Amino acid sequence: MAMSFEWPWQYRFPPFFTLQPNVDTRQKQLAAWCSLVLSFCRLHKQSSMTVMEAQESPLFNNVKLQRKLPVESIQIVLEELRKKGNLEWLDKSKSSFLIMWRRPEEWGKLIYQWVSRSGQNNSVFTLYELTNGEDTEDEEFHGLDEATLLRALQALQQEHKAEIITVSDGRGVKFF
């Protein structure tokens, strides 16, 4: 079932595509952009992108209004998301990024809640089983990309709730 995305009112407002000079207005505008990016990526389960892809995406390019957020402004929005812990640059040139509509700690908490709820403590899973197995089909983390999953499991490992291990066909995790 494909869900349609409901664009916020600002997306239909041409000045939204120009970062405003007034500090207070700009902060509100950046907060709106951050919220939009996270909602859009969450709905589309999009976890990584390049800045060039972002610039051409409907996210930053409103074809109906014929308005596009300039690449310099996109970089500012992305940097704001990084400061909040929702984005990680994948290269030094800052041309590609991992977008996390939930921070790794939040994903870890969701995964661990499922483990506890389903009585899976002291069990070992492959990464594939966790995100693509039948047992997790109804969970929000089902289909989660491996990069984000690993960050979530690393957060759980720091809390001594899990250990990332090597299994015969790749990586796995043991929950405590």
Curated annotation (Swiss-Prot):
Q: In which tissues is it expressed?
A: Expressed at the mRNA level in kidney, liver, pancreas, and placenta. Lower levels of expression are found in heart, skeletal muscle, brain and lung.
Give start-end of the signal peptide: none
What outcome follows a substitution of residue 126 to K?
Answer: Abolishes binding to CHMP6
Subcellular location(s) of the protein:
Cytoplasm; Endosome membrane; Nucleus, Nucleoplasm
What molecular functions are annotated in GO for this chain? protein homodimerization activity; structural molecule activity
Q: Which UniProt keywords apply?
A: Cytoplasm, Endosome, Membrane, Nucleus, Protein transport, Transcription, Transcription regulation, Transport
Q: In the UniProt record, which is one GO cellular component term?
A: nucleoplasm
Checking Pfam families in the record gives: ESCRT-II
Tell me the Gene Ontology biological-process terms attached to this UniProt entry. macroautophagy; membrane fission; multivesicular body assembly; negative regulation of epidermal growth factor-activated receptor activity; protein transport to vacuole involved in ubiquitin-dependent protein catabolic process via the multivesicular body sorting pathway
Q: Which SUPFAM superfamilies match?
A: Winged helix' DNA-binding domain
Q: Which InterPro entries match?
A: ESCRT-II_cplx_Vps25-sub, ESCRT-II_cplx_Vps25-sub_N, WH-like_DNA-bd_sf, WH_DNA-bd_sf
**Entry's family note:** Belongs to the VPS25 family.
PANTHER family from the entry?
Answer: VACUOLAR PROTEIN SORTING-ASSOCIATED PROTEIN VPS25, VACUOLAR PROTEIN-SORTING-ASSOCIATED PROTEIN 25
Oligomeric state and interaction partners are given as:
Component of a complex at least composed of ELL, SNF8/EAP30, VPS25/EAP20 and VPS36/EAP45. Component of the endosomal sorting complex required for transport II (ESCRT-II), composed of SNF8, VPS36 and 2 copies of VPS25. Interacts with CFTR; the interaction requires misfolded CFTR. Interacts (via C-terminal half) with the ESCRT-III subunit CHMP6 (via N-terminal half).
Q: What is this protein for, i.e. what is its function?
A: Component of the ESCRT-II complex (endosomal sorting complex required for transport II), which is required for multivesicular body (MVB) formation and sorting of endosomal cargo proteins into MVBs. The MVB pathway mediates delivery of transmembrane proteins into the lumen of the lysosome for degradation. The ESCRT-II complex is probably involved in the recruitment of the ESCRT-III complex. The ESCRT-II complex may also play a role in transcription regulation, possibly via its interaction with ELL. The ESCRT-II complex may be involved in facilitating the budding of certain RNA viruses.
- Protein name as it appears in the record: Vacuolar protein-sorting-associated protein 25
Record organism: Homo sapiens (Human)
Please state the gene responsible for encoding this protein.
VPS25
